A protein has these predicted regions:
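Glycine-rich phosphate-binding loops of nucleotide-dependent enzymes
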Residues: 1-190
Length: 190
């Protein structure tokens, strides 16, 4: 809904003080919002490098910065999108969104269906993005523990409405609320 691919039933989407509710997705992207779809949506018949540059905009995120962050993509830059593993495709989808140099990055289920080693690699990337690039990230993720570890604030939605809002660290330690909201039992830590 924030990106404009799902119709809103009520409410408004504001970004940087501007009502984006009625803008097409491409206009929202031009306003500084990057989006990584759950389905990845890379271009299978383009090379990695072509995927990265097809919608790129000038800024800190250029090919050199992307290849430094995603060494696997540098190694595979001449491969076609459909020749990449699922994890590499997800890296490419995130990297392509970064090449638009967004101020806000929306990540929809970025860890879904990926091998644990790839999930760990992407967690490191997201952590670096949050620490070094001054980029805001909205993370939609069903792996609650991972999401809470990565984020500062947590918002639990139920049918599109806010069911609960708290600091992520606070919610991580509130096992009763977690179990009530998402059915998650967090192992006690010593």
């Amino acid at each position: 809904t924030i990106m404009g691919y799902t119709q809103m039933r009520s409410g408004q989407v504001f970004w940087r003080g501007k009502d984006m509710s009625r803008l097409a997705p491409n206009r929202r992207a031009l306003g500084g919002i990057g989006w990584v779809a759950q389905e990845r949506e890379i271009f299978p018949s383009l090379t990695v490098e072509e995927n990265l540059t097809v919608a790129s905009r000038p800024g800190a995120w250029d090919l050199a910065a992307i290849y430094k962050m995603f060494a696997r993509l540098a190694e595979r830059r001449r491969n076609m999108g459909n020749q990449l593993s699922g994890g590499e495709q997800q890296m490419l989808a995130i990297a392509r969104a970064l090449m638009t140099n967004p101020a806000l990055l929306l990540l929809d289920e970025p860890f879904e269906g990926l091998a644990p080693v790839i999930v760990e690699e992407l967690i490191k990337v997201i952590t670096l993005l949050l620490a070094d690039r001054k980029i805001a990230i909205v993370l939609v993720e069903q792996h609650t523990e991972v999401a809470l570890e990565l984020t500062r604030d947590a918002v639990v939605l139920e049918r599109g409405a806010v069911a609960h809002r708290a600091a992520s660290a606070e919610l991580m330690h509130d096992t009763a609320t977690l179990e009530r909201l998402v059915g998650l039992r967090v192992a006690a830590t010593a």
